[in-house]
From Swiss-Prot:
Protein name: Small ribosomal subunit protein uS11
Functional description taken from the UniProt entry: Located on the platform of the 30S subunit, it bridges several disparate RNA helices of the 16S rRNA. Forms part of the Shine-Dalgarno cleft in the 70S ribosome.
Gene, per the UniProt record: rpsK
SUBUNIT field: Part of the 30S ribosomal subunit. Interacts with proteins S7 and S18. Binds to IF-3.
Gene Ontology MF terms in the entry: rRNA binding; structural constituent of ribosome
Organism: Coxiella burnetii (strain CbuK_Q154) (Coxiella burnetii (strain Q154))
InterPro entries referenced in this protein's UniProt entry, alphabetically: Ribosomal_uS11, Ribosomal_uS11_bac-type, Ribosomal_uS11_CS, Ribosomal_uS11_sf
Pfam families, per the entry: Ribosomal_S11
UniProt similarity note: Belongs to the universal ribosomal protein uS11 family.
Keyword rRNA-binding on entry: yes
A single BP term in Gene Ontology: translation
GO CC terms of this entry: ribonucleoprotein complex; ribosome
Keywords: Ribonucleoprotein, Ribosomal protein, RNA-binding, rRNA-binding
Amino acid sequence: MAKKRYRKVTEGIAHIKATFNNTMISVSDSQGNVLCFRSAGGSGFKGSRKGTPYGAQMASEEVGRLARDNFDMRRIAVRVKGPGAGRDSAIRGLRSAGLEVIHLEDRTPLPHNGCRPRKKRRV
């Protein structure tokens, strides 16, 4: 069976959503079409280990390798969303996969006193 042909995309955008329970990374082209996706849960981490920085780094290394090998991607802009623990380590994982980070943007949604927040945890 022949290997699937991918189109060449040299620059892309990495969308990182870091929640407290998981970290999702998707790589798209400049128009926003998703090329590849990986999460910490999809990288083999289960339960509370999905929300760790190590899980985010492994997922971003995998998605970075996919983007580099399949789409010949070299440069990437990063958009981070969410308060999770895997924010910085996901960016580090993309760099270690051989991608050059050209732009870094924080898109965490902040309410202008909108909905009432969740109750405080009592441990």
